[in-house]
Amino acid sequence: YYIHPAAPPWYVAKYGFDFMLGVPGDVAGLGAFDDMTGLGIFNGLYGRNANVFAAVPSLHSAYTLVAFIYALRSHSPRWITAALGIITLGIWFTAVYTSHHYIIDVSLGILCALAGYLIFEYLLMRWRPFARFIDRYAAYVAPRRR
């Protein structure tokens, strides 16, 4: 988003296509949740967003897809994989429905996740020094139970 700043739908609806730095973040469609619950969760998160021009690619879409892919690969219990699949689809839908992303943003996020997964698994993990580092790191952060 530093190379190609892209405004989300809520920004275009509010300010048009003028590039204005210093515009505060906006909760957009997620404000309805805050209004219904009285919690102010999304106002607290998005209201302080320092960079409103980070819509492309949608990292919300990418992160959830990566979690889902690794749940599939790890042979997690079916209910966990199903839950992550539903959450992933829900985030993709919600990102567009609440005016935080366009469909193209979500699509590019999905492509980034797939590209990252393929690069990591089929290029980097085949390079021995990198694979050894990852194995040592995994052992360090998740020691085996005895």
Segment roles from a protein language model:
Residues 119-146:
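Membrane-proximal cytoplasmic C-terminal regulatory module of class A 7TM GPCRs
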Residues 1, 80-97:
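Small-polar-interrupted transmembrane alpha-helices in polytopic inner-membrane proteins
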Residues 68-73, 113-121:
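Hydrophobic transmembrane alpha-helices
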Residues 72-82:
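Membrane-interface helix-loop-helix junctions at transmembrane boundaries of multi-pass membrane enzymes
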Residues 5-12, 74, 102, 124-132:
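Perimembrane helix-loop junctions in membrane proteins
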